[in-house]
Amino acid sequence: DDPLRVVRLVRLAAQLALEPDAETIALARATAPAAARVAQERVFAELKRIVAGDGVIASLALMDEIGLTESVLPELHALHGVEQNRYHHADVHTHTIEVLAQAIALQADPGAVFGAEHAAAIDALLAEPLADEVDRGFALRLGALLHDVAKPATLGRRGDGSPTFLGHDRAGAELARDVLTRLKASEKLKAHVAALTRHHLRLGFLVHETPLTRRALYRYLKASEPVEVDVTLLSVADRLATRGHKAQEAIAKHLDVAREVMPAALQWRAQGRRPPLVRGGELAAALELHNGPELGRLLGEIDEARFAGDVTTPEEAVAFAARLLEGD
């Protein structure tokens, strides 16, 4: 007997639009704990097909029903019953499934949020092969499932008893990496999903910096690359699935910022890294500096100023760096 069959049951039920009968469900429940002992690369091969499938939401519900989630994705199972603050309408697990549903809807029709003029570029990006025989669209779904995975571990309480999850983005990036390491995923997929988890809150922070400056936009893109487009999509899905106190106002503001960020993110990704206005050695010679953190900081400041349109030539870049040094 191969316990992997219970994972295949979930996949085939969705693929063939079948509803397992009571006897099959009972047998699956009895077998599900043994799935934890199956070679993880075999489990992941089936999970990839489940997550990529059209019926993934129903598949995840079936996995919960038969106890399979607890065996093969215990971190997802642990989200059940973890309450959130008043800005959420559901516990962490229900919210996570709704984020996945919103991500799937965005994947199917990005133009509904970002306009027809950007839909083709987003479609093309999500269709790009990534690693482990999956594309970026699959990775977005996986990121949706794992974006809040560290909330149980980071749960705290304010004085009034309301829950907090400070640092769940950073801790979640490590936990997402651990999950995918256990499943024998490639380093590239692990890094991609960890980055989605790590940066999924960034766009929400930008809402408090409106109207956006070019410098604020630069810092967002620089911090979140190479998932600057993907994580913008994930952030929108996350916001749309958060429907608690003052939700409509918050969603509207979030979408306004996302619509401003997305064209810049697409352009940033399409253009790639531009040759610097001035190289480190040239700047060091001009300002009589040694290689080190200070030189790196100045080069970063020049790059940000260039994005903002404040410097456009090598000479302006050197003069700008000199002014920064004088200010220090």
Regions found by a protein language model. Give the residues of each.
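Glycine- and charge-enriched loop/helix tracts that form the active or gating conduit
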Residues: 1-137, 141, 145, 149-167, ...
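Short amphipathic alpha-helical surface micro-motifs
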Residues: 42-43, 123, 177, 214-217, ...
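Alpha-helix capping/termination and helix-coil
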Residues: 103, 107-111, 144, 148-153, ...
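A generic structural signal for short, non-catalytic loop/turn and secondary-structure boundary residues
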Residues: 69, 92, 227-229, 271
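Short, low-complexity, polar/charged sequence segments that are solvent-exposed and flexible
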Residues: 162-164, 216, 253-254
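Terminal helices and disordered tails flanking the catalytic cores of nucleotide-processing hydrolases
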Residues: 203-210, 243-328
